[in-house]
């Protein structure tokens, strides 16, 4: 493993532990030359999961893309990064457990919105406004009414 700081090829593992319910291993490493410390993850290589976009194009599933969307929606909100990473893992696990090779982007968006509605309502509305592409204030108000109804149940 090359050091991301000085690119020296000699590193040593300081600590290893299973994460994601044993589906991957987190390793803390240290460069033998510059002593820079960094983290790596070792995961099982799974068959590719293809996302079918609204316009019909296809791209490989990206857990990082989901996490970026969650982080953006939760910007300046009291939501821990660990919680967003957990949501991302849950969504990926649920999709892979379905045993399909393709999934619609709408399915992923709905899964994200469902989980965000339980974590932070402001983040939910932010994500929904981008995901659902609200055309005017009335559509936005209807979404807020639905959120309020769900909260009263």
UniProtKB/Swiss-Prot annotation:
Its cofactor is Zn(2+). Negatively regulates transcription of bacterial ribonucleotide reductase nrd genes and operons by binding to NrdR-boxes. Keywords: ATP-binding, DNA-binding, Metal-binding, Nucleotide-binding, Repressor, Transcription, Transcription regulation, Zinc, Zinc-finger. One of its GO terms (molecular function) is DNA binding. Disulfide bonds: none annotated. InterPro entries: ATP-cone_dom, NrdR-like_N, RNR_NrdR-like. The keyword Ribosomal protein does not apply. HAMAP family: NrdR. Residues 49-139 form the ATP-cone domain. This is Transcriptional repressor NrdR. PANTHER family: TRANSCRIPTIONAL REPRESSOR NRDR (PTHR30455:SF2). The gene is nrdR. Binds 1 zinc ion.
């Amino acid at each position: 493993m090359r050091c991301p700081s000085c690119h020296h090829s000699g590193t040593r593992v300081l600590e290893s532990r299973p994460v994601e319910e044993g589906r991957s291993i987190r390793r803390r490493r240290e460069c033998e030359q510059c002593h820079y410390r960094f983290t790596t993850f070792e995961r099982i290589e799974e068959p590719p999961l293809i996302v079918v976009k609204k316009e019909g194009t296809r791209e490989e599933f990206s857990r990082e893309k989901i996490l970026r969307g969650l982080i953006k929606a939760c910007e300046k909100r009291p939501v821990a990064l660990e919680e967003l990473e957990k949501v991302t893992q849950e969504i990926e696990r649920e999709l892979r457990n379905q045993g399909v090779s393709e999934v619609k982007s709408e399915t992923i968006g709905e899964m994200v919105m469902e989980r965000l509605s339980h974590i932070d309502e402001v983040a939910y509305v932010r994500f929904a406004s981008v995901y659902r592409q609200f055309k005017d204030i009335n559509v936005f108000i209807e979404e807020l009414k639905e959120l309020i109804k769900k909260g009263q149940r």
